[in-house]
Each structure stands twice: as structure tokens, then as C-alpha cells.
């Protein structure tokens, strides 16, 4: 999916294509977890605790991803904040 596909109207997808897309996401996530450092789950828990001091959120509203890009690592934190 490229950037322009995101803004176009989506056609109804068959349940098979939706299942395939979800499975690809799960497989990619599992592959990423294999190379994740041991401290990443603890880091995610602590980040959630800090965010909860200021905003009421669920665990599934915070995603922490560590990407290795050559000689550097990128820690990406995505937080879905509730409406005010």
C-alpha cells in the first residue's frame, strides 16, 4: 500500500483479503519481536505507567517498536490519545 492508496476510497475487501492482510501484520510483528531486546517489554510497561499519570489510556493504545537501520536503532512510540 502506498501513501496515495491511504487517501483513496477503499473498495469492499473480501474476508479472505482482510484475513491475509491481518496475518501479514501478525507475521511482521512476530519477526520484529524475535530481534527485540529483552528490556523492550519492561520499557513499554513503564512508558504506559508514565503516560497514564496524565491521560487515561489502555495498554493496546501504546505501541513501541524498535527498528535497526544499519548502524543505528530507532525507537518508535505510537500513542493513541482519547478525544477530549
Curated annotation (Swiss-Prot):
GO terms for biological process: cell division; regulation of division septum assembly. Gene3D superfamilies: Cell division topological specificity factor MinE. Keywords: Cell cycle, Cell division. InterPro entries: MinE (IPR005527), MinE_sf (IPR036707). The keyword Nucleotide-binding does not apply. It holds the Pfam family MinE. HAMAP family: MinE (MF_00262). Belongs to the MinE family. Prevents the cell division inhibition by proteins MinC and MinD at internal division sites while permitting inhibition at polar sites. This ensures cell division at the proper site by restricting the formation of a division septum at the midpoint of the long axis of the cell. This is Cell division topological specificity factor. It comes from Azotobacter vinelandii (strain DJ / ATCC BAA-1303).
Amino acid at each position: 500500500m502506498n501513501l496515495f492508496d491511504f487517501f483513496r476510497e477503499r473498495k469492499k475487501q473480501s474476508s479472505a483479503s482482510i484475513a491475509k492482510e491481518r496475518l501479514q501484520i501478525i507475521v511482521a510483528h512476530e519477526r520484529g519481536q524475535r530481534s527485540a531486546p529483552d528490556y523492550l517489554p519492561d520499557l513499554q510497561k513503564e512508558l504506559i505507567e508514565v503516560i497514564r499519570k496524565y491521560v487515561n489510556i489502555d495498554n493496546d493504545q501504546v505501541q513501541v517498536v524498535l527498528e535497526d537501520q544499519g548502524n543505528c536503532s530507532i525507537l518508535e512510540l505510537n500513542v493513541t490519545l482519547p478525544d477530549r
